[in-house]
């Protein structure tokens, strides 16, 4: 039986030199890489937290999904990841395609398989991250803080 996605996850931020937040990458991996390089991001000492919506609109959505597998990346689930998961699960692609999911259709078969595998892993992304750092507690969500 599959375990449901944790709604809330905690991160011990004190183990990282710097914690960087990035919202709505939307498939623009090279732009993110340039910014991280500019900030002297060190994947062995720093943490990148994505605030969701790593896919759609930009040219590198598959690579952005694969970024989530890196040891130095954590993420909360955004509405674009949820749209993609729902579209594939229920074979109803229209809403996702209207919101930038056309990159998936343009992929070769083997890349679509990779994207599906990566999107399945997104089911385990929390909706809320709580980071405890030297400066206190920080709560990260994509858009709305769930009131339940």
What do these predicted ranges mean?
Residues 13-19, 131-138:
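Beta-strand-turn-beta hairpins that frame and shape the catalytic cleft
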Residues 2, 12, 18-22, 27-96:
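Core catalytic region of metal-dependent phosphoesterases/phosphodiesterases
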Residues 137-148:
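Divalent-metal (often Zn2+) His-rich catalytic cores of metallo-beta-lactamase-fold enzymes
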């Amino acid at each position: 039986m599959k375990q449901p996605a944790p709604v809330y996850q905690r991160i011990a931020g004190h183990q990282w030199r710097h914690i960087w937040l990035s919202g709505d990458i939307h498939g623009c991996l090279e732009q993110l890489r340039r910014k991280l390089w500019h900030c002297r991001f060190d994947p062995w000492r720093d943490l990148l937290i994505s605030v969701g919506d790593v896919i759609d609109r930009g040219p590198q959505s598959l690579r952005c999904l694969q970024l989530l597998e890196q040891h130095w990346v954590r993420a909360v689930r955004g509405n674009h990841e949820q749209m993609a998961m729902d579209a594939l699960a229920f074979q109803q692609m229209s809403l996702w395609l209207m919101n930038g999911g056309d990159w998936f259709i343009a992929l070769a078969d083997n890349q679509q398989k990779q994207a599906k595998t990566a999107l399945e892993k997104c089911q385990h992304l929390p909706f809320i991250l709580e980071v405890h750092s030297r400066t206190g507690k920080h709560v990260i969500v994509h858009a709305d803080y769930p009131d339940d």
